[in-house]
Amino acid sequence: MAAEIQPKPLTRKPILLQRMEGSQEVVNMAVIVPKEEGVISVSEDRTVRVWLKRDSGQYWPSVYHAMPSPCSCMSFNPETRRLSIGLDNGTISEFILSEDYNKMTPVKNYQAHQSRVTMILFVLELEWVLSTGQDKQFAWHCSESGQRLGGYRTSAVASGLQFDVETRHVFIGDHSGQVTILKLEQENCTLVTTFRGHTGGVTALCWDPVQRVLFSGSSDHSVIMWDIGGRKGTAIELQGHNDRVQALSYAQHTRQLISCGGDGGIVVWNMDVERQETPEWLDSDSCQKCDQPFFWNFKQMWDSKKIGLRQHHCRKCGKAVCGKCSSKRSSIPLMGFEFEVRVCDSCHEAITDEERAPTATFHDSKHNIVHVHFDATRGWLLTSGTDKVIKLWDMTPVVS
């Protein structure tokens, strides 16, 4: 008798469309060319490549250009086809790409920094080129003349850069874990405020100008959502990676955040839910549930003739508790904890199954990601990894 084969339930996951190989070193940055089946990449091997899809279905370089120094970052403007490339020697080189993307014409070079350029943004509306470098300098230049308009010294090397055109606010994330907000004028800037919420360095920034929300990723494995538009100082933490968060991208039309990490994980977060701030951790000399003293509370230990215990914290209420009163674990997705974390026994009983429902999906890119670019129109995601490979994914099964 033949056994009936039950079809497997369909799991929604990204579809790998293409792999692009050939770089001798890591591809530090790459972008999907809008309205074209093409990709522009810059690599540590000093090459700039424009990959176009051939009749065979494979992507091959139509432009292969060697730079005088390793390429650390880039910014591409599709309307003007202007390509700004940051180099390891501190130079920014600008090119114009031909309409068919088969030719790259040099426009100008300028010495923007004393050492490696870490981030570049080209702002078409103001004709500015914003950049940060390992010299701890943020600078902005006129893209027409190449003239330096102004600068600001950051507290540490910057690794994240975003700009809001409407308010002329620039957001700079650095290795100290700080996010600095500056207001830019034509030739000067003023410090607006600084945010500090990460225990590690900021590795990526993403700005949503519609909701006026800033996302920051960090080497502490977390993402923080800073609600600037709400004007209440709300900061929501998202915990979904096992390694440093390397890149962030936001899909405005579906209100989903894509975070990618050194663990190879692609996490898609539903930001269209009412999320809650994580509570401040409370300090206490004894367990706030059973009143047992903690190990540094010698007086209570002596008076009660009890051995001091180690202090823990409930992730839901923030109370200081002992191990016995916090023996349970639970995920709390609305607080950003997609993995199970320590909670006190009373909070564990109070958390409902609905509150445990996941608000993120997890996918494996099978390479340690260093950079991503999301094309919202087609729903394509580009990932670049430490394996020197560029991968192109169709994200429509999970970003919709």
UniProtKB/Swiss-Prot annotation:
Pfam families: FYVE, WD40. It comes from Homo sapiens (Human). A zinc finger (FYVE-type) spans 281-352. InterPro entries: G-protein_beta_WD-40_rep, WD40/YVTN_repeat-like_dom_sf, WD40_repeat_CS, WD40_repeat_dom_sf, WD40_rpt, WDFY1/WDFY2, Znf_FYVE, Znf_FYVE-rel. GO terms for molecular function: zinc ion binding. Zn(2+) 2 binds at C314, C317, C344, C347. GO terms for biological process: positive regulation of fat cell differentiation; positive regulation of protein phosphorylation. Keywords: Cytoplasm, Endosome, Metal-binding, Repeat, WD repeat, Zinc, Zinc-finger. This is WD repeat and FYVE domain-containing protein 2. The lineage of its organism: Eukaryota, Metazoa, Chordata, Craniata, Vertebrata. It comes from the Eukaryota. Zn(2+) 1 binds at C287, C290, C322, C325. WD repeats lie at residues 22-61, 66-105, 112-150, 153-192, 197-236, 240-279, 364-399.
